[in-house]
A protein has these predicted regions:
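Juxtamembrane helix-loop junctions of ABC transporter transmembrane domains
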Residues: 21-22, 29-38, 42, 55, ...
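ABC-type nucleotide-binding domain
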Residues: 332-585
Length: 585
């Protein structure tokens, strides 16, 4: 928690200092009111007192109450501004950090957990800051100030208040000690419930297709029940605080009045009024002490959860990055568009075996390099090393003659147009999706966007869509078919005019005719770009300049289609499983 609070700016500390001044004023005015109450009590009991004197004392008491209220409002405004600025900055830092994560770091958490940490956890810390400035500063000041005032009164009253304070502290500490472990568990259970809910929503069609609603409901109920039980235990434990404090407060009042009655009964007549007046004042001060502890209870309710949330936020912010920026912006002259793999191997964290092993090849400017092989043989892993989604554990990957680790990530990725296996569209318009991202230019003109759409064979359906390139795209592109989303994703990559185009099984949602026309168009319009294609269909890659066949993470064949049909058994088996001998001829 302290580590996060260090992220407060100097402006926040100035506001905190202003809030502290208002708190001092508020406490002083609140603790002055009992003095005027004592004065009014004496005036009422004294013969010959003027009503004007009572009204003046009452007016001063009212002024103190209004002043205390105004100071409390000012404190609240300062606290709200500090907490809002802090949470906004913290959310920005978490988002920026997550943006820097590689697939390895994201895998260490989970999407559901990262969302919870970026929203709910930061809100918990924000609430603690608000309550901390409004209550945590005020309560100790109020308690100490009030105790100093009552210490000058009767020692029996002071002793009874001291006993009440010790009982309160012990009770609160026990409650917090019991509830804290449950609050720590609560956040992980919330992550689990979010994960189950997210899985169900994203896979709803599969769930329905297999009539698995009952199974999913059971998973949700189990996660929900465990979360509910933990919440109930934690909330019940913390919920006993208020009744416990109320009981102590009532017991303290009873003790004060009992002691007061005893003192008054044994006092001389002229001392009875003074003792009675002191008892009224002492009761008010004692209640201020107890109220201070009641305010602290509000902090203790928030503190366990906020402490856990702060730890989870720090886990994200302190996560070391496996992919670090280099310093170079440009490659070697004369090597533009060239990609080389030198004895590259890669192993996922905690895995025992390399996913790919000793991969070596060179792709020259303008060439089409295709990858094919069985599912899980490492095709996507190989091409994901070019934009540094993963870094090689052995060997080197070079772009334009420079190791990719030496580039800044921005400079490297400005050279690349990437189309993922699953087409990803963002909420906005067709134009905003095609012209998406920063490639080092000031933006894309409408003509460039339309040309990219035409090259990607998306012009026909875009023209038919109401609004054309300005047509609305729903979240995830849910208002477009799989093939349409795939073509718009391809248009987005083409629009950048990159040195390197990467298609990670990006033609799978296209029909054979569109696939063929698109590849022919790419060969003409993107002739200077080095093209990498991962595919399962022989028809998609048979015209490539170089086909790399992978099996169990190793290269088992490399060459053109006709060469591989003669020399590579794995390629030949894949080819014959899809096409007849006549079609392959």
């Amino acid at each position: 928690m302290v580590k996060l609070l260090k992220k407060l700016t100097w402006k926040d500390f100035i506001l905190a200092a202003v809030a502290f001044v208002f708190i001092i004023v508020q406490v002083w005015l609140s603790l002055t009111m009992p003095d005027y109450m004592s004065e009014i009590t004496k005036l009422v009991q004294t013969k010959g007192s003027k009503m004007n004197d009572i009204l003046i004392a009452g007016g001063k008491m009212l002024a103190c109450a209004l002043g205390s209220l105004l100071a409390a409002v000012c404190t609240s405004i300062c606290a709200s501004k500090i907490s809002s600025n802090f949470s906004a900055n913290l959310r920005g830092q978490v988002f920026h950090k997550v943006q820097s994560f590689s697939m390895e770091e994201i895998g260490n958490f989970s999407t559901a957990s990262l969302i919870t940490r970026s929203t709910n956890d930061i809100t918990q810390v924000q609430m603690l800051i608000v309550m901390g400035l409004e209550v945590l500063l005020k309560a100790p000041i109020m308690a100490v100030w009030a105790l100093c005032k009552i210490s000058t009164k009767n020692w029996q009253w002071t002793a009874s208040t001291g006993v009440a304070v010790v009982v309160l502290l012990s009770f609160v500490c026990v409650c917090v000690a019991v509830a804290l472990p449950k609050f720590k568990k609560l956040q992980s259970l919330t992550d689990n419930l979010n994960r189950v809910t997210r899985e169900n929503l994203t896979g709803l069609n599969v769930v329905r297709a297999y009539n698995a609603e009952g199974y999913q409901q059971k998973k949700f109920n189990d996660a929900n029940d465990e979360l509910t039980k933990t919440q109930l235990f934690a909330n019940r434990t913390m919920g006993t605080m208020m009744p416990g404090i109320q009981m102590v407060m009532n017991g303290l009042m009873l003790a004060i009045y009992w002691i007061g009655a005893y003192l008054i009964s044994n006092a001389q007549m002229f001392d009875k009024l003074t003792i009675f007046s002191d008892m009224i004042v002492f009761t008010q001060y004692a209640m201020q002490v107890v109220m201070s502890f009641m305010m602290l209870v509000m902090i203790f309710v928030l503190l366990p959860r906020a402490s856990v949330s702060a730890k989870r936020i720090n886990e994200v912010l302190d996560m070391p990055l496996s992919i670090k920026d280099g310093t170079k912006e440009n490659g070697i002259d004369g090597k533009k568009g060239e990609v080389e793999f030198r004895n590259v191997s890669f192993c996922y964290p905690d895995a025992e075996k390399d996913v790919i092993e000793d991969i070596s090849f060179t792709a020259h400017k303008g060439e089409t390099i295709a990858f094919i092989g069985s599912t899980g043989c490492g095709k996507s892993t190989v091409i994901n090393m070019i934009p540094r989604f993963y870094d090689a554990t052995k060997g080197e990957v070079l772009v334009d003659g420079v190791n990719v680790k030496e580039y800044t990530q921005k400079a490297l990725r400005n050279k690349i147009g990437y189309v993922s296996q699953k087409a990803v569209l963002f909420t906005g318009s067709i134009k905003s999706n095609v012209a998406y991202g920063d490639n080092g230019t000031k933006g894309f003109t409408d003509d460039v966007v339309k040309q990219a759409i035409e090259t990607a064979q998306a012009k026909e359906f875009v023209d038919k869509t109401e609004g054309g390139v300005d047509a609305f795209v729903a979240q995830g592109g849910s208002n477009f078919s799989g093939g349409q989303k795939q073509r718009l994703s391809i248009a987005r990559a083409i629009c950048r005019h990159p040195e390197i185009l990467i298609f990670d099984d990006s033609f799978s949602a296209l029909d054979y005719k569109t696939d063929r026309v698109l590849r022919d168009t790419l060969r003409k319009t993107c002739a200077d770009a080095t093209r990498f294609i991962v595919a399962q269909r022989i028809g998609t890659i048979r015209d490539a300049d170089k086909i790399i066949v992978l099996d169990d993470g190793k290269i088992v064949g490399m060459g053109k289609h006709n060469e591989l049909m003669e020399t590579c058994e794995v390629y030949r088996q894949i080819a014959y499983s899809q096409l007849s001998k006549e079609e392959l001829a």
